[in-house]
Amino acid sequence: FFLQDRDGEHHSPGQLYDRVSEIFVLPGLKGSSQRESMFSLFLSCLNDIPDPLLCDVARIVTRYFASRGNEVLTHLQITPNRQFLYLKAFFILKHDIQGRNPQTLRRVWITRLCEECPSLLVPQLDAYGYEYFDLEHVCSEASTHHVYDALFWALDRRGLTTLAMDQLDKLAMDLAQHTHQVLDDGVDDRADSEAESSREGVCKRFKKLHLALTMAFRLCVENSLSSSASVEFVHELWFRVLYTLVRLEHAFYDSSRIHAPKDSLLALALSHSQTFTQEALATLVTSVPSETISFAELFKRLVHGISQANIMY
């Protein structure tokens, strides 16, 4: 009754844990062997425990059934959202700095974060540091679920920052190509539900790109201020980001649609790409010492690169 919240108390978070703790101090249940005998009953009740009380379940497992944690995790895997709610209690920001959570738990947590709450992934990575989680697993899951800011973070911590820039360029160019395909389908000339869905899809992809760019800017700044990064490497990172953005912006200067209305998808795409470029330049100018990177050399290289590029969509 207590576990299934059927005794009329309608537990709020914390109360279920308190009531179970009261049971386990009763005569005959104080010993670990006696409590262990109740584990199968506890496990059989998990599916009926309300979602808001799953953090209490995590506390109960940690205190009374610590050796059976994997069984609980396995039992909950058929309901990924509930498994995510259960795991939240183990990964309060900066709570497990000593590394008590086993790697199995950490790996499942990364997967569930990518699926259920991708915006929390980078804060988790920042809080625990690059040695806490399996970064190869982070890269795999973040790539699968298109959580690009976390993917770039993990690649950088693995010493693969240039690969992150490759991913950024591909993401931007794929977006440009997709946007042109939608435009060629006449989305700006129609007002039906399919056209609206296509517009929304493009807007979502721009939002994903913005998140990825924000992380790319951050990585550029961090490497610019790092004593271990060479000037040549820092220059290359900034060039890669700016070159990608200039190419993206140029992709939407379409002379055949030069007079497109301001609310058209083309105008929106161009506005977004211009804003991204402005953000990159503002970050570069305000965050990187002028002696660290030659702006004149960087912009000269950009102009040359763009003049040599053959951009096809």
Where would I find each of the regions flagged by the language model?
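Extended non-globular scaffold/tether segments
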Residues: 1-139, 148-156, 161-313
